[in-house]
């Protein structure tokens, strides 16, 4: 059974992509039937299984896939074939482009994850960090822009 539908509310993004606001069709996790979510390009962007959800004005588009119990909030963007699994939580102005996120990862601030980077385990990435060019961050990592961890 489908857990959400696309509404008639749309935005044009990057000048050529139409994104649709989503509306929950049933209760699941902390989402109630009728709640409005963020924006997606196609239903393939957000799984109808489990408790994953896109909140606020967050966006998923261009072959992004969000699964399991992942939660994407605020103005975060997931795009360009990015995949997020597990109990990940993505906040603020994070951009995940072509990245792969697994597990109980938390990413917030103005972080950019790009170019096939893989972030997994109980990792937190925040502030103005960047993970690019096939970066791999393993379990129990903690990184911010004020650290000298090379991303």
Residue ranges and their predicted role:
Residues 1-51, 122, 141-151:
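Terminal amphipathic alpha-helical/low-complexity segments used for targeting or macromolecular assembly
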Residues 23-26, 57, 75:
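Short, flexible beta-strand-to-coil junctions
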């Amino acid at each position: 059974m489908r857990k959400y539908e696309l509404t008639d509310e749309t935005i044009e993004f990057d000048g050529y992509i139409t994104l649709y606001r989503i509306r929950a069709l049933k209760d699941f996790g902390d989402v109630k039937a009728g709640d409005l979510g963020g924006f997606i390009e196609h239903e393939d962007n957000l799984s109808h299984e489990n408790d994953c959800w896109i909140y606020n004005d967050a966006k998923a588009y261009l072959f992004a896939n969000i699964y399991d119990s992942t939660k994407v909030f605020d103005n975060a963007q997931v795009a360009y074939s990015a995949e997020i699994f597990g109990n990940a939580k993505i906040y603020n102005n994070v951009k995940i482009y072509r990245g792969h996120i697994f597990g109980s990862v938390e990413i917030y601030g103005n972080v950019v994850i790009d170019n096939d980077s893989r972030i997994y385990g109980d990792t937190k990435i925040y502030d103005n960090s960047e993970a690019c060019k096939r970066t791999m961050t393993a379990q129990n990592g903690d990184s911010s822009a004020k650290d000298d961890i090379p991303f």
